[in-house]
Amino acid sequence: MKASMYLALAGLVLLFVVGYASESEEKEFPRELLSKIFAVDDFKGEERGCKGFGDSCTPGKNERCPNYACSSKHKWCKVYLGK
């Protein structure tokens, strides 16, 4: 029982030492990760300038993207193939 406790304690100490060593080598990683996360959140509030395939639309008012057509049956954008 004592041996398993010492082994578990040694494992935790080893995990702590390895974690500390890797953290000291990559101090910029958490800052870069947080800046990327917050940069992605900035784009959520912006409206897309152009409707894409599968986006909902109003038939007859698809002036945003000429290469897509608004399906009057399904009310979503589909690829315009021409007539």
Swiss-Prot record:
Residues making up the signal peptide according to the UniProt record: 1-21
One of the Pfam families matching this protein, by short name? Toxin_12
Covalent S-S links between cysteines: 50-65, 57-70
Q: What GO molecular function terms would the record report?
A: ion channel inhibitor activity; sodium channel regulator activity; toxin activity
Leucine amide: residues bearing it: 81
The tissues in which it is expressed are:
Expressed by the venom gland.
Give the pro-peptide residues: 22-48
An example Gene Ontology cellular component term from the record?
Answer: host cell presynaptic membrane
Question: Keyword Transmembrane, does the record have it?
Answer: no
Q: What is its main location?
A: secreted
Q: Which family does it belong to?
A: Belongs to the neurotoxin 10 (Hwtx-1) family. 15 (Hntx-3) subfamily.
Record function comment: Lethal neurotoxin. Selectively blocks tetrodotoxin-sensitive voltage-gated sodium channels (Nav). Does not affect tetrodotoxin-resistant voltage-gated sodium channels or calcium channels.
Subunit details: Monomer.
Protein name stated in the entry? Mu-theraphotoxin-Hhn2g
Species, as recorded: Cyriopagopus hainanus
Q: What is the lineage of its organism?
A: Eukaryota, Metazoa, Ecdysozoa, Arthropoda, Chelicerata
